[in-house]
Amino acid sequence: MEQPLTGSYVIGQPTSGEQVGNYLLLHELGRGGYAHVFLAEHLYFKQLVALQLLNLSLNQHEDLVRFQVEARLLAQLQHRHIVRALNFDWEGDTPFLAMAYAPGGTIQQVFQQGTPQPLLRILPVVLQIARALQYAHNHHIIHCDVKPENILLGPRNEVWLADFGIATTIGSLPRTSYGRQEIRGTVRYMAPEQLRGTPLPASDQYALAVLVYEWLCGGPPFSGTDIAVCFQRLSTPPPRLRERVPSISPTVERIILKAMEKDPRLRFAHVLEFASALKKASLGQR
């Protein structure tokens, strides 16, 4: 049930052993800018879940709206490669979202920064992410924050795309509650048009291509402060992959750089087309 977006949401920080709704908090899995995530167990079903609780040290209307939007989107997007929403409720003034628990952690723990990965190892992950993104795009949703921390691994090592907290609908512009246009995302993976405040479905394709580049090379195409990366992303072509990893085929390099074109109209028509082209090109690298 939705609560009014007024009043104070500040209470003590959640801790292991506490009960929230019908869930017992076991231990913290992580925390972000606006929420804590706990491994929790349903008191009656004994089902393990990832329980996301709004960061109650904040009292911000926009964070609460974002939390509710994420819950609604996850409930609508039913796909095998998107994390499942199981429940959304309130414990007093505390909103919480129960999601399927990903025992494999995040892909960040598998493809570690600084370690180049073979194309054939990352390809199954790329295809699963692309299918999840394509499904979201077909339902008029742009994820806007594709990055390793938001790619989870389920019980059979399958990929789950998570964190739709800053997702937006196609054709709308992210704005604050005061009507100001807002730039959201993680600079390291943001497309030029997203940096300008106008994300498109092609922005998710760009972010996925940056991930592929990073995994193949062991590092991002651009580095430095967020401001420096922004300027490079808007004005400088990414370094060629083959300069860093000569074993990568010219075809694979061309596909990845096409998906990273600064003009979104020059990228692939759909994110799944990018992943499919990469799969086809990989046959020549066996």
Where are the language model's segments positioned?
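Conserved N-lobe ATP-binding subsite of Hanks-type protein kinase domains
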Residues: H36
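AlphaC helix of the eukaryotic protein kinase fold
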Residues: N55-Q76
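Activation-segment/catalytic-loop signature of the eukaryotic protein kinase fold
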Residues: F88
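Conserved short submotifs of the Hanks-type protein kinase catalytic core
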Residues: G92-T106, V110
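Activation segment signature within eukaryotic-like protein kinase domains
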Residues: V125-V126
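Protein kinase catalytic-loop region centered on the HRD/HxD motif
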Residues: R131-I141
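Activation segment of protein kinases
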Residues: R156, A162-R196
